[in-house]
């Protein structure tokens, strides 16, 4: 049975091939008041992300079928969504590659659930602030008589 998403809540897609990790993340995200979607491989992650357009993606780097770095790159080409990479790979070069391919944040396994939830909130807040600034900028006009100035 597919769970209905509450349109008043942010939706987070969890993409990981380890079911225990998905279960922990989904439990904690729901406890924080988020809708959740799940994908267990990279191909499914791309499909769910592009179909459902979640507000944030938690994305493992090492995935079957399509790796997380490729998922990140493909999704970011279509729409701007905060992506938080989760990986057992903690080398600096891995973090840099993930961030350069479009990830907004990177956390290594094992991770603190409390830290991860704080990062989720921070990335959602940052994205909301950016969207609000774009919307405000789009609506800023000065009209004097017949003269209209877009700011």
Segments the model singles out, each with a brief description of its role:
Residues 50-52, 74-81, 101:
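Conserved phosphotransfer cores of two-component systems
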Residues 22, 64, 91, 109:
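The feature encodes the CheY-like receiver
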Residues 23-31:
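Charged docking surfaces used in two-component/phosphorelay signaling
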Residues 33-40, 48:
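Short hydrophobic/Thr-rich beta-strand motif most characteristic of the beta2 strand and flanking loop
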Residues 41-44, 67-70, 75, 94:
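Acidic catalytic/metal-coordinating carboxylates
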Residues 8-11, 122-151:
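Short, Lys/Arg-enriched segments at the junction into DNA-binding effector domains
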Residues 52-58, 63:
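Active-site beta3 strand of CheY-like receiver
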């Amino acid at each position: 049975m597919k769970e209905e998403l509450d349109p008043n809540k942010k939706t987070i897609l969890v993409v990981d091939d380890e079911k225990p990790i998905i279960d922990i993340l989904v439990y904690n995200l729901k406890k924080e008041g988020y809708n959740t979607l799940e994908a267990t491989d990279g191909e499914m992650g791309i499909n769910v992300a592009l179909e459902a357009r979640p507000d944030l993606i938690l994305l493992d780097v090492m995935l079957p079928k399509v790796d997380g770095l490729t998922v990140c790159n493909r999704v970011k080409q279509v729409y701007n969504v905060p992506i938080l990479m989760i990986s057992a790979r903690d080398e600096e070069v891995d973090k840099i590659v993930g961030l350069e391919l479009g990830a907004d944040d990177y956390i290594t396994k094992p991770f603190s659930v409390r830290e991860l939830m704080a990062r989720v909130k921070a990335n959602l807040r940052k994205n909301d602030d950016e969207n609000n600034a774009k919307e405000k900028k789009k609506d800023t006009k000065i009209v004097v008589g017949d003269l209209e100035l877009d700011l």
